[in-house]
Swiss-Prot record:
Protein name, UniProt field: Large ribosomal subunit protein uL14
UniProt cross-references to Pfam families, sorted A to Z: Ribosomal_L14
GO cellular component: cytosolic large ribosomal subunit
Organism: Buchnera aphidicola subsp. Cinara cedri (strain Cc)
GO molecular function, one term: structural constituent of ribosome
Amino acid sequence: MIQVQTILNVADNSGARLVMCIKVLGGSRRRYANIGDIIKVAIKEAIPRGKVKKGEVVKAVVVRTKKGIRRTDGSMICFDNNSCVIVHDTTNQPIGTRIFGPVTRELRVEKFMKIISLAPEVL
């Protein structure tokens, strides 16, 4: 459950380490984002010589949340942190070439097959 001002970890090798949500995309009054939703983020902390710089505003896909997600079989998947993957503004393809940590199957429904194929584990 990500809202404006939430700090997230970055789960790829784009060069960003921490980002802050500045907008939840998908409706003028939409307040929260869950796994698989696209958000607008500002880069708060980045490594030198990365693909993105501190202060840039980019799009990101939420891949892990502490609140988790409920499946139709009744199971619940929760994570230890809130994480996202930075994507291109137009194509919604990931900027990085590697994904760190597990992602959920719910990304498949949202058409993020590239993120699923790069992830080391799909829950």
